[in-house]
Each structure stands twice: as C-alpha cells, then as structure tokens.
C-alpha cells in the first residue's frame, strides 16, 4: 500500500514547520505581503496546516471558511497567486521536499486559484481593499 502524501511529507509536525516558513516568507514578500495586513498570523497558520493536513490524507479536519469566502474582497491578482505558489515552492525546496511530493501538493493547491483570484492581472504588491473583512483571531481552545 502506498503511503499517503501526508506521511511522505513527514506528518503534522513537518507540515506545520513548512507552513510557518511559508507564512513568514510571504509576510516579507513585497509582492504579496500587503494582502496579509489584517490577517491573524496564528489563525492563518492553523487553518493552512489543517487544510494541507486534511488534503494530503492526514488526520486533521479543516473547519475554516471555504477559499471563496476567506478571500472575498481581498482583490487577489493572478500575479499575487503566482507569487504565493513561488514562495511555497521555495520553502519546499528549502526543506528538501522531493519533486514528486511537491508536484502532488501543488496539484492540490492549483485548483484553489479560481476560488482565490478576483482580479485578472499579473500585477503584484496591490493593497488590501478596505472592504475586506478578516476572520477573527482563534480562541485559545482552537489553537491546539
């Protein structure tokens, strides 16, 4: 029996380490960091870990908003989504994740483009529109 992508990525601890590194990289990336201006970092990490964990066959359950709702009014461009993907790939390379696993993970993330991108433009570094309403911070009970 073939091991799940979750297992091949190293489980929850490894996924968490990668997600933390991705988020930290994105917060420093001028191509996309403005989109995170009002995002709660802890919530973003928790929700992203749960989403990746569940999507790769792990035991986690993603309970956050769907991607259309979560990114509604963010004005994410095609260029910014591409910058996000490039940051993910750079971190996966830093963590020496194999090409097969990277391809499988990117194939999971790729369909989300249509739910996240609202602006058909290659522009990056756009400001977060004032209409965007971020999700609230996680309660202490949900962080664990």
Give residue ranges: language-model regions.
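Core of compact, soluble alpha-helical bundle domains
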Residues: 1-144
């Amino acid at each position: 029996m073939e091991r799940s992508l979750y297992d091949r990525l190293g489980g929850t601890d490894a996924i968490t380490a990668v997600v933390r590194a991705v988020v930290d990289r994105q917060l420093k990336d001028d191509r996309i960091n403005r989109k995170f201006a009002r995002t709660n970092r802890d919530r973003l990490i928790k929700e992203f870990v749960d989403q990746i964990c569940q999507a790769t066959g792990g035991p986690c359950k993603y309970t956050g908003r769907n991607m259309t709702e979560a990114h509604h009014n963010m004005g994410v461009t095609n260029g910014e989504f591409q910058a996000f993907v490039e940051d993910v790939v750079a971190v996966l390379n830093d963590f020496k994740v194999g090409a097969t696993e990277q391809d499988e993970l990117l194939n999971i993330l790729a369909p989300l483009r249509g739910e996240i991108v609202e602006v058909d433009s290659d522009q990056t570094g756009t400001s977060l529109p004032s209409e965007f309403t971020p999700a609230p911070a996680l309660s202490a009970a949900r962080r664990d």
